[in-house]
A protein has these predicted regions:
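C-terminal alpha-helical interaction appendages
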Residues: 1-71
Length: 71
């Protein structure tokens, strides 16, 4: 993971935390445990960075729902 994608992951963790009213540490654990960071956010960084954070948070929610991750 390069510096740009790392910063993007941190930004998206905070965006999800704000929308879900959760602590960023909680969101990080859920995203890491589900593989969302390494299998979805980082590989799709180039595409995702051009979308709004609301759209990306929705995509992350869909990713987690498909894997039966609750939060």
């Amino acid at each position: 993971m390069n510096q740009e994608s790392f910063e993007f992951v941190v930004y998206m963790i905070h965006a999800c935390a704000n929308k879900w009213n959760r602590l960023p540490s909680f969101v990080y654990r859920k995203l890491a445990e589900s593989g969302c960071i390494q299998k979805f956010i980082v590989p799709n960084y180039e595409i995702l960075q051009s979308l709004t954070s609301d759209v990306i948070v929705g995509d992350i929610e869909d990713y987690l729902k498909e894997r039966n991750v609750t939060f």
